[in-house]
């Protein structure tokens, strides 16, 4: 349960991960805590989900695909082509099994932090954006200057802006777009219409 988890316990449990990834997990955890407090989400849940979102990110793409199949996860054709997208669902499965995390909203935030999905909760949006706002990724997402300020003003619009950028970027690169991202886009258009 989330109540029994602490960042210190998570740091010990995942100390085997590469240092660069651990640093990212710490930054995202801190950003998620701050965004959660701003948007009246439990900051501790934000910090914990932020730390856990990428615990399977260092795994080889072939392993991610094989592991997803072995666990019986539904693998979308886009995930078959781009197995790195499975690191969120596999991280959620891992923390549920290894740590006993049962908080479904936290597990969803971990699962969907790469693609988003329709009907995202505030916690899911917080973790999604905290991952994208990691200062070490600055410059990685050209055209998204101002996203941190927007995340403080309107969480829905900030997530929408990132997802629109992501979809456009993938289209320009000839990449595949996960249907969950399209569902997130359409849902956020509906939510923000008229604002």
Where are each of the predicted segments found?
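Short, low-complexity, intrinsically disordered N-terminal peptides in bacterial proteins
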Residues: 1-12, 190-195
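Divalent metal-dependent catalytic cores for phosphoryl transfer on phosphate-bearing substrates
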Residues: 8-16, 23-24, 33, 38-161
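Long, amphipathic alpha-helical surface segments
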Residues: 155-173
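Charged phosphate-binding loop/patch that engages nucleotide di/tri-phosphates or the phosphate backbone
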Residues: 168-195
């Amino acid at each position: 349960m989330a109540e029994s988890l602490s960042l210190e316990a998570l740091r010990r449990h995942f100390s085997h991960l590469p240092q660069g990834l651990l640093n990212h997990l710490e930054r995202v955890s801190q950003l998620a805590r701050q965004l959660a407090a701003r948007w009246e989400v439990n900051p501790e849940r934000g910090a914990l989900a932020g730390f856990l979102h990428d615990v399977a990110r260092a795994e080889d793409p072939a392993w991610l695909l094989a592991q997803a199949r072995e666990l019986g996860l539904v693998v979308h054709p886009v995930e078959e082509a781009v197995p790195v997208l499975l690191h969120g669902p596999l991280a959620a499965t891992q923390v549920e099994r290894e740590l006993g995390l049962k908080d479904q909203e936290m597990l969803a935030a971990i699962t969907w932090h790469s693609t988003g999905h329709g009907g995202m909760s505030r916690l899911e949006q917080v973790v999604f954006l905290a991952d994208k706002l990691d200062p070490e990724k600055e410059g990685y997402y050209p055209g998204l200057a101002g996203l941190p300020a927007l995340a403080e003003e309107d969480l829905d619009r900030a997530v929408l802006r990132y997802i629109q950028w992501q979809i456009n970027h993938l289209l320009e690169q000839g990449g595949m777009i996960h249907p969950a991202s399209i569902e997130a886009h359409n849902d956020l258009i509906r939510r923000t219409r008229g604002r």
